[in-house]
Design a protein with these regions (language model features):
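Glycine-rich phosphate-binding loop of actin/hexokinase-like ATP-binding domains
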Residues: 161-233, 238, 331-337, 341-343
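Short beta-strand-loop/turn "lid" adjacent to the catalytic site in phosphate-handling enzymes
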Residues: 97-143, 151-161, 178, 322-325
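Conserved phosphate-binding catalytic cores of ATP/NTP-utilizing and phosphoryl-transfer enzymes
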Residues: 27-43, 143-176
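ATP-binding/phosphotransfer module of carbohydrate and carboxylate kinases, centering on a glycine-rich
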Residues: 6, 10-101, 218-375
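Glycine-rich beta-strand-to-loop/alpha-helix junction loops that act as flexible
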Residues: 107-111, 181-183, 310-320
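Short, acidic Gly/Pro/Ser/Thr-rich loop/turn segments
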Residues: 58, 112-114, 184-188, 243, ...
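Active-site nucleophile and cofactor-binding loops and adjacent substrate-binding regions
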Residues: 122-123, 142-149, 168-171, 178-181, ...
């Protein structure tokens, strides 16, 4: 059985403290994540079934942990839409892996979590902590938002898991933020208390989209046909790419490329559009992605300002790693800095792209091992 050690060599572990230190985004100064239950483990070993449960897929994993080390020992991926509930996915995992007997379950879920109860934003699922206990017999269950799990997952990342989009200014400590466009749009913060960072969830992706130009207003009015409220998720999540493309055809009267339209019938339209934009083979696709990247830059700026995220912003989710060439073009950075009188602050903030798509699953594992122990 292959075991993956999730204890990068640049972590500095003091058994007397329940924090993990990792490399700063800008230089060799350190930032830290708080795990208050870790010191309570001592030499005890715990087995955690951890999961990242989203609208498209669910990544499940087994972690084994002591106070000094956490190991990833098994992973499986499932298509969420093919199952009626997360319980069925967990049961499928246990059927496929009968040799594991976890004593706790920790799930990062794509939706708001209240008192052990969560509704998946882009699936007709309700996840209930009590139901999981009843169905599995496992008493220690945690449900956290998937972006909060992503933030905790930073503890298990190495330098190779990041791509610097903007280096910012070195040596600045402070709050941090995570923004993740995928099936939906997730946002989270990490509060800096002067010693360690504490991740927390938000639902900022559902805040109102703000229009600045006539083009923005036209797109807003077009989207209102399908959305009661046009949110930031309406313009910078996966489905938004196809919506923006159709807006350009129907409202802006851009010429339709029949080859692109045929590809939509057998492939994910958003992927077709972004790939054509990167390749430079279709002008309408290129224009659609310019809209998308512009709005992504603006919302990154918004999140930095609202969190006062001087410690850095992590760009996560399924889409950014697939459009790296577009993020390296001037449009993203120009819109990142295009704010009201706070350009000097935003310019100092490091921005990194998180390349490891298992970060939410890993974060759920670390939370289950080292935070749930304090409950």
């Amino acid at each position: 059985m292959k075991v993956h050690r999730l204890f990068p060599r640049f972590f500095h572990f003091n058994p007397l403290h329940s924090v993990f230190n990792l490399m700063s985004m800008a230089d060799s100064s350190k930032i830290s994540l708080a795990f208050p239950g870790r010191q309570l483990l001592g030499d005890k070993k715990v087995c955690v079934l951890a999961g990242d449960v989203g609208g498209t897929k669910a990544n499940l994993a087994i972690f084994e942990a002591t106070a000094g080390q956490i190991n990833l020992v098994k992973t499986s991926t499932y298509h969420s839409g093919q199952y009626p509930s997360v319980i069925k996915i967990i049961q499928q995992f246990f059927q496929e892996n009968p040799g594991y007997q976890p004593d706790r379950i920790s799930l990062g879920v794509a939706g708001p979590v209240f008192e052990g109860h969560a509704e998946i934003t882009n699936l007709p699922w309700i996840i209930d902590k009590k139901e999981i206990i009843a169905e599995t017999g496992i008493q220690y269950i945690s449900l956290i938002n998937d972006l909060e799990a992503t933030a905790y997952g930073l503890a298990g990342m190495e330098e190779k898991d990041f791509l610097v989009l903007h280096p910012g200014e070195s040596g600045i400590r402070g709050n941090m933020a995570v923004l993740a466009p995928g099936t939906g749009l997730g946002e989270a913060g990490l509060f800096w208390d002067g010693q360690v960072h504490h991740p927390f969830a938000t639902e900022g992706g559902h805040a109102d989209f703000s229009c600045r130009s006539a083009d923005d207003m036209e797109l807003h009015d077009y989207l209102l046909k399908d959305f009661k409220v046009v949110s930031w998720e309406s313009v910078i999540a996966g489905p938004a790419i196809f919506d923006i493309y159709n807006f350009l055809l129907q409202v802006k009267k851009r010429p339709e490329n029949k080859q692109i339209s045929r590809a939509f019938k057998s492939e994910d339209p958003s992927a077709v559009i972004s790939e054509a934009a990167i390749a430079g083979t279709d002008h309408v696709c290129m224009e659609a992605m310019k809209y998308f990247v512009r709005y992504l830059g603006r919302e990154c700026c918004n999140l930095i300002l609202k969190m006062k995220a001087t410690g850095g912003l992590f760009l996560a989710g399924g889409i950014p790693p697939k459009i790296i060439p577009l993020l390296k073009q001037p449009g993203f950075y120009e819109n990142l800095l295009d704010c009201d009188r706070m350009q000097d602050l935003v310019k100092k903030v490091p921005v990194k792209l998180l390349l490891n798509d298992k970060a939410p699953m890993i974060g759920a594992g670390w939370y289950g091992a080292y935070y749930l122990s304090s409950k």
